[in-house]
Amino acid sequence: MDEILKYFPNLTDLQIEQFQKLDFLYHNWNEKINVISRKDIDSLYTKHILHSLGIAKVMKFEPGTTVLDVGTGGGFPGIPLAILFPETRFYLIDVIAKKIKVVQGVVDALELKNVKAEQKRAELVKGDFDFIVSRAVTNMPDFVSWIKDKIKKQHKHKLKNGILYLKGGDLSEELKDFPAATLYDLSEIFEDEFFETKKVVHLPLKFKP
């Protein structure tokens, strides 16, 4: 929890309480449904929560923003971002029902009113969103093909509507067909060596009628 306060010192008392609860909630759920690897669960705050919040260092969501989290797994990056941005609406989806069961359990325990969680494929999602977030669920060309028709036309942020994607390693080959993509190195924001090769990729996408 200390690493969260280090990089996000202006949290409200409620946000601090919610972030603190995540430790118990995920350890408890993980004993029943394995959504976080055994070797990573004890590094929950660094490898999952702080990593998710890397998006918040790139983009401050304005009130009323809508965000789709594709392949949310146990709720990352959606749940940490929903705690940080209570006036932003988050829609978390995953194709695996037991993962959504965990997500819903955590959301209910935290009383997050700005989160909807559902078992669904990205291609079947109705509606459009300001931003679509994810954490390395697939390669970028496939990801874009899933969600390219789900971006809102009107922009209200400095960064244009589109994808905010958490991924590590050398992305040059994967992004060669996306010259509009901008990479933000999390190693320049967070000190832990875990973030040495981790990045946030912003890929603006035009509205597709």
From Swiss-Prot:
Function statement: Specifically methylates the N7 position of a guanine in 16S rRNA.
Species, as recorded: Flavobacterium johnsoniae (strain ATCC 17061 / DSM 2064 / JCM 8514 / BCRC 14874 / CCUG 350202 / NBRC 14942 / NCIMB 11054 / UW101)
Coiled-coil residue spans: none
EC number: 2.1.1.-
Family according to the record: Belongs to the methyltransferase superfamily. RNA methyltransferase RsmG family.
GO CC field: cytosol
Chief location of this protein within or outside the cell: cytoplasm
CDD domains: AdoMet_MTases
An MF annotation (GO) of this entry: rRNA (guanine-N7-)-methyltransferase activity
Name of the protein in question: Ribosomal RNA small subunit methyltransferase G
Uppermost EC category: transferase
Alphabetized InterPro entries for the sequence: rRNA_ssu_MeTfrase_G (IPR003682), SAM-dependent_MTases_sf (IPR029063)
Keywords: Cytoplasm, Methyltransferase, rRNA processing, S-adenosyl-L-methionine, Transferase
Binding site for S-adenosyl-L-methionine: 71, 76, 122-123, 135
